[in-house]
Amino acid sequence: MFSKTLSVSRLLMTRSFYSSTVVKNVSIFDFEKVYNLSKRPTGDKSTVLIDVREPDEFKQGAIETSYNLPVGKIEEAMKLSDEEFSKTYGFSKPVFEDNVVVYCRSGRRSTTASDILTKLGYKNIGNYTGSWLEWSDKIKSK
């Protein structure tokens, strides 16, 4: 029985290790990094900041310079032509080499979004895991 428990434990540890390696392709962004992104000059398109919450959540408050693309629409959106994407979402479709940073309310949906973008072939993904909850709290003191 002990060896069976040990085998299950090893399996769980192995799964945990391998599932966390996917995250290694994604940079974790903190408040300061995102704050600096939000203060970029208007024409600076070096990084795209995407809020993956639903449109009604986005309308209630969002980080400056961010665009809204709900997590449930990311996969189909990224398959649109550049023109159709821009027309539908109001910003230029990121290319695979662009720096893309995602956030949501608490970090869960942004983690899902970063996984989707990675699987679609995007190379430079950032996840602001503190997301809107942290942002709306910390921005008050800035």
Swiss-Prot record:
Protein EC = 2.8.1.1
User: What InterPro entries does the record point to?
Assistant: Rhodanese-like_dom, Rhodanese-like_dom_sf
Q: Which reaction does it catalyse?
A: thiosulfate + hydrogen cyanide = thiocyanate + sulfite + 2 H(+)
In this chain the Rhodanese domain maps to: 43-140
Transit peptide, first to last residue?
1-25
Tell me which Pfam families the record gives.
Answer: Rhodanese
Top EC class per UniProt?
A: transferase
GO CC terms in record: mitochondrion
Q: Which GO terms describe its molecular function?
A: thiosulfate-cyanide sulfurtransferase activity
Q: What is its main location?
A: mitochondrion
Arranged from A to Z, the UniProt key words for this protein are: Mitochondrion, Transferase, Transit peptide
At the top level of its lineage, which domain of life is listed? Eukaryota
Report the locations given in the UniProt record.
Mitochondrion
CDD domains from the UniProt entry: RHOD_HSP67B2
> So where's the catalytic machinery, residue-wise?
104
Read off the PANTHER family from this record: THIOSULFATE SULFURTRANSFERASE RDL2, MITOCHONDRIAL-RELATED, THIOSULFATE SULFURTRANSFERASE_RHODANESE-LIKE DOMAIN-CONTAINING PROTEIN 3
Q: What does this protein do?
A: Thiosulfate sulfurtransferase which catalyzes the transfer of sulfane sulfur from thiosulfate to cyanide.
* Name of the protein: Putative thiosulfate sulfurtransferase, mitochondrial
